[in-house]
């Protein structure tokens, strides 16, 4: 196996067994003795594929053996296999008839980064956000019972995703309805237990065997007739298992817990899964894997190798670097440290996105004021509300797509009480290859309808810094939404001065047409304005809207064009239209933004072009409307 990034194969490896296992049916025709060799081939294939396309890396390497075992033992796709999040699903895609399409992974018109029902019958549930698998698999298990079907339902969830409340809600409900389903905990961080070895593997085989299950059920029927006897026996079994395995929590929730077992020991996994396949009631299998298994750099640095960019040919000349500024997330991270030094009331909160949201420096400089709440967006927001009640100034650093999961808390716990919570909303707009499940397409729409909410959209790095200061000093809930990637390299002021709330800025004076820009499309708007001599306005604030400026522009121009990287429906442009209607002002309007579709994965530039939000698309749309109006 390769030991460095440069050693990842650039040519498709020779894989005679994998060639015969292109589908689960083909896999099940292989001898069990061949499966470990197949695992080596699949690992090489995954290294090659992701090296060519880029994408999620470490998680897939860690579940090679688990994926093989699941498709070998269960009758997929008739048996329903649900992957949580989907970062680990690349081996699953390779084994389910999509190997020859893997080089289109995450590319325009190619296969998706995550399981998609529309892509394959083996993708039984579409995912992207975490902690949904148990609920989905439970729904499938209940449906199977209602349909008198014997098909199995299996959820595979990581130890990180299991921290979310939704997962425990599903675990609790499953035991209430005594669902026939299997949950597999893919523990690749060893955060629950390190007790893995020969003894626990042996114990798992015993506890999952039909003999043990039959004896257990028979004893339960007998002892249930004696008051208190079954409870004593259950506790005795629980304590005995608890001495060797860490499953007490799941046993208390009513699940039959098996494990932990070595997730890279194929014979043990296959034997255990065969035993558990026909057990009744909710079954829980704890599998310990190593993220990045088989590729030393990823094993050593699983966070750094969570995802990688594609390998370029060794002889390819380096592409000239475009002039660009720092990443927007880096600007936020620097501001957070600067404001924390100036205001000891500031605290930083993130739901498991320390690296992505650029809170690493803050966490190291102010560890007592940094709170990573794990994958618990609802808790993160209400935690911030509680802190704000006591005079703290919380900053919730969160991706736009994940803030959707805490919308009730945002309204009920923060906004209704008018609490001082600043939401630093990263990955707003289109995010590229991860596709619609990770896009931040709706935040302006769902934020601007909340009374008292301050909503800002920066056009560059310096505007972002000023808006963060504005939100921090605002009395009430505030949100700043900014995109993934780098800015236009605007000079950044080192001060912490706020903006005047609700005031836009005219960046270019033209005639007839005014381009009202909400966000980072300002540069494209300026290009277009040069071609048609349009006025360009950096609106800055979605709420409160600069109503005086909008009225002024409506009075001095023949066409107003709103531009935003948000859903057109209910977005910033809609706010302009609603205001003009309320003032009985009739003025031609053109709203440019994200259409009423899920924009499929592609490179960000391709997605913007598809939506008409690049300079060429904006110019074409504006000119077409000018022709209609006779301008």
Swiss-Prot record:
SUPFAM superfamilies referenced in this protein's UniProt entry, alphabetically: Thiamin diphosphate-binding fold (THDP-binding), TK C-terminal domain-like
Cofactor note: Binds 1 Mg(2+) ion per subunit.
Alphabetized UniProt keyword annotations: Isoprene biosynthesis, Magnesium, Metal-binding, Thiamine biosynthesis, Thiamine pyrophosphate, Transferase
Known catalytic reactions: D-glyceraldehyde 3-phosphate + pyruvate + H(+) = 1-deoxy-D-xylulose 5-phosphate + CO2
Positions of thiamine diphosphate binding: 87, 128-130, 160-161, 188, 295, 377
Enzyme Commission number(s): 2.2.1.7
Alphabetical list of CDD domains matching this protein: TPP_DXS, TPP_PYR_DXS_TK_like
EC class: transferase
Organism annotation: Pseudomonas putida (strain ATCC 700007 / DSM 6899 / JCM 31910 / BCRC 17059 / LMG 24140 / F1)
A single BP term in Gene Ontology: thiamine biosynthetic process
Stored SMART domains: Transket_pyr
A molecular function (GO) term: 1-deoxy-D-xylulose-5-phosphate synthase activity
One GO CC annotation: cytosol
Subunit note: Homodimer.
Family note: Belongs to the transketolase family. DXPS subfamily.
Family annotation (PANTHER family): 1-D-DEOXYXYLULOSE 5-PHOSPHATE SYNTHASE-RELATED, 1-DEOXY-D-XYLULOSE-5-PHOSPHATE SYNTHASE, CHLOROPLASTIC
NCBIfam families named in the record: dxs, PRK05444.2-2
Cofactor (UniProt): Mg(2+); thiamine diphosphate
Pathway info: Metabolic intermediate biosynthesis; 1-deoxy-D-xylulose 5-phosphate biosynthesis; 1-deoxy-D-xylulose 5-phosphate from D-glyceraldehyde 3-phosphate and pyruvate: step 1/1
Function of the molecule: Catalyzes the acyloin condensation reaction between C atoms 2 and 3 of pyruvate and glyceraldehyde 3-phosphate to yield 1-deoxy-D-xylulose-5-phosphate (DXP).
InterPro entries in the record: Dxylulose-5-P_synthase, THDP-binding, Transketo_C/PFOR_II, Transketolase-like_Pyr-bd, Transketolase_BS, Transketolase_C
Keyword Cell cycle attributed: no
Superkingdom classification of source: Bacteria
Identification of the protein by name: 1-deoxy-D-xylulose-5-phosphate synthase
């Amino acid at each position: 196996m390769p030991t460095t990034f440069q050693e990842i194969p650039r040519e498709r490896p020779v894989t005679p067994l994998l060639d015969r296992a292109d589908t689960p049916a083909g896999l099940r025709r292989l001898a069990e003795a061949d499966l470990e060799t197949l695992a080596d081939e699949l690992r090489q294939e995954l290294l090659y594929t992701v090296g060519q396309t880029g994408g999620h890396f470490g998680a897939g390497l860690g579940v090679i053996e688990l994926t093989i075992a699941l498709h070998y033992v269960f009758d997929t796709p008739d048996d329903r296999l649900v992957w949580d999040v989907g970062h680990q699903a690349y081996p699953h895609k390779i084994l389910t008839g999509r190997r020859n399409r893997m080089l289109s992974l995450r590319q325009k018109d190619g296969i998706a980064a995550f399981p998609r029902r529309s892509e394959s019958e083996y993708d039984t549930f579409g995912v992207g956000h975490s902690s949904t698998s148990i609920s989905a698999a439970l729904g499938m298990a209940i449906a199977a019972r209602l349909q008198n079907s014997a098909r199995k339902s299996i959820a595979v969830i990581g130890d990180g995703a299991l921290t979310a409340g939704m997962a425990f809600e599903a675990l609790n409900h499953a035991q209430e309805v005594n669902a026939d389903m299997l949950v597999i905990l893919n523990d690749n961080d060893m955060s629950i237990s390190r007790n893995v070895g020969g003894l626990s593997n042996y114990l798992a085989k015993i506890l999952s065997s039909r003999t043990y299950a039959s004896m257990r059920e028979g004893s339960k029927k007998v002892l249930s007739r004696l008051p208190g006897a079954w409870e004593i026996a259950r506790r005795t079994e629980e304590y005995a298992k608890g001495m060797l395995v860490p499953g007490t929590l799941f046993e208390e929730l009513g699940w039959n817990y098996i494990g932990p077992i070595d997730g890279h020991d194929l014979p043990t996994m296959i034997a255990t899964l065969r035993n558990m396949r026909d057990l009744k009631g909710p079954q829980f299998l704890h599998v310990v894997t190593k993220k990045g298994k088989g590729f030393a750099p990823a094993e050593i640095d699983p966070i750094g190798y969570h995802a990688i960019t594609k390998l370029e040919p060794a002889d390819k000349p380096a592409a000239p670097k475009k002039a660009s500024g720092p990443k927007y997330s880096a600007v936020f991270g620097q501001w957070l440290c600067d404001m924390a030094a100036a205001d000891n009331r500031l605290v930083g909160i993130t739901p498991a996105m320390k690296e992505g949201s650029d809170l690493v420096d803050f966490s190291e400089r102010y560890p007592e004021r940094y709170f990573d709440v794990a994958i618990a967006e609802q808790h993160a927001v209400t935690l911030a509300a509680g802190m704000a009640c006591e005079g703290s100034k919380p900053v919730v650093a969160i991706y736009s797509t994940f803030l959707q999961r805490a919308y009730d808390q945002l309204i009920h716990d923060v906004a209704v009480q008018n609490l001082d919570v600043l939401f630093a909303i990263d990955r707003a707009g289109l995010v590229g290859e991860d596709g619609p499940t990770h896009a931040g397409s709706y935040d302006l729409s769902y934020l601007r309808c909340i009374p008292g909410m301050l909503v800002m959209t920066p056009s560059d790095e310096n505007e972002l810094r000023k808006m963060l200061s504005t939100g921090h000093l605002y009395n009430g809930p505030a949100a700043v939404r900014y995109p993934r990637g780098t800015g236009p390299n605007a000079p950044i002021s080192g001060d912490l001065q706020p903006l005047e709330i609700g005031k836009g800025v005219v960046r270019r004076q033209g005639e007839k047409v005014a381009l009202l820009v909400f966000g980072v499309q300002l540069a494209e708007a300026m290009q277009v304005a040069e071609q048609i001599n349009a006025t360009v306005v950096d609106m800055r604030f979605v709420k409160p809207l600069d109503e005086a400026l909008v009225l002024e522009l409506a009075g001095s121009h023949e066409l107003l064009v709103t531009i935003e990287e948000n859903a057109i429906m209910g977005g910033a442009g809609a706010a302009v239209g609603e205001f003009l209607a309320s003032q009985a002002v009739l003025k031609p309007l053109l709203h440019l933004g994200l259409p009423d579709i899920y924009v499929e994965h592609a490179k960000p530039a391709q997605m913007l072009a598809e939506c008409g939000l690049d300079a060429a698309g904006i110019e074409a749309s504006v000119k077409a409307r000018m022709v209609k109006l006779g301008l």
